[in-house]
Amino acid sequence: MTEADIAVKSSPRDYKKLTRLYCMNGGFHLQILADGTVAGAADENTYSILRIKATSPGVVVIEGSETGLYLSMNEHGKLYASSLVTDESYFLEKMEENHYNTYQSQKYGENWYVGIKKNGKMKRGPRTHIGQKAIFFLPRQVEQEED
């Protein structure tokens, strides 16, 4: 194996592993609650544990591990949790230059991103754009106990 081989090979994320999405804006974790609400959590909790599943290259669905509900964005840009994966549940995952990830609605558009405001409430898709701290998330792997 040469140095060039090492430089271009990256280890793919294990999508069976559990993750928290830590927002650059205010330090909140994305959480999916049992009632279908999506919000930011200041502290780590069971509702902020997520499973990010790739459906095709660069496209993911985000499932709340505790609730089994899927993150979705409606036609008004409001984030909600759905019991079924619909066309509103697919997000384009991209690692940005700052090494944070963004999650852009595949259905609704060029500049509709998942985002958390400074107060922990979710930001509507049409009010987001690249460069805002609200849309940058750092995936943090959750340590799982061995069975």
Swiss-Prot record:
Any Gene Ontology CC annotation: extracellular space
Keyword check for Ubl conjugation: no
Gene3D superfamilies the UniProt entry points to: 2.80.10.50
SMART domains: FGF
Origin superkingdom: Eukaryota
SS bonds (residue pairs): none
Gene Ontology BP term (one): positive regulation of intracellular signal transduction
Pfam families given in the database record: FGF
GO molecular function, one term: S100 protein binding
Residues binding heparin: N25
Stretch list, region Heparin-binding: 117-133
UniProt keyword annotations, A-Z: Angiogenesis, Cytoplasm, Developmental protein, Differentiation, Growth factor, Heparin-binding, Mitogen, Nucleus, Secreted
Coiled-coil ranges per UniProt: none
Main subcellular location of this protein, as a coarse class: secreted
Record's subcellular location: Secreted; Cytoplasm; Cytoplasm, Cell cortex; Cytoplasm, Cytosol
Function description: Plays an important role in the regulation of cell survival, cell division, angiogenesis, cell differentiation and cell migration. Functions as a potent mitogen in vitro. Acts as a ligand for FGFR1 and integrins. Binds to FGFR1 in the presence of heparin leading to FGFR1 dimerization and activation via sequential autophosphorylation on tyrosine residues which act as docking sites for interacting proteins, leading to the activation of several signaling cascades. Binds to integrins.
The family this protein is said to belong to: Belongs to the heparin-binding growth factors family.
Protein name: Putative fibroblast growth factor 1
Species annotation: Danio rerio (Zebrafish)
